[in-house]
């Protein structure tokens, strides 16, 4: 069955958008979920100051009426002006291991951006650099943190198949306190 992309237009749909991540990773011992109320505030134009210079829409991917993916499409006009770019960001992306689903989500963001004059796509990024960014490419068997994005190992493979290339390496380190400080 074909993938249907639905724009989130109601609070109930936004709640489904947020909760999909919890359901999707509920059996994964390494994923640390975001706090639900924090996500509601992040996606709210009334509560997130980034909406003063950003615009965004959220999309759900459905198959047979069941949510199989999600993505946020974001334009940060301040960043685009600063860097002299026309970039649409994709963020909060999650999808089942199906290239049709990931393709539909990314193509939706590209088209959304094109309709608004954007010529490039970049992500995963949030509204600003204060949001979680990047895509895990190794360390899937390590406990994530609330400050980073956790994703399944097939995500980078899907992005590569969609023609995307890594632009930077971001490294997270765990530092242990020694038992004895010399």
Question: Where do the model's predicted regions map?
Answer:
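Alpha-helical subdomain
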Residues: 47, 74-78
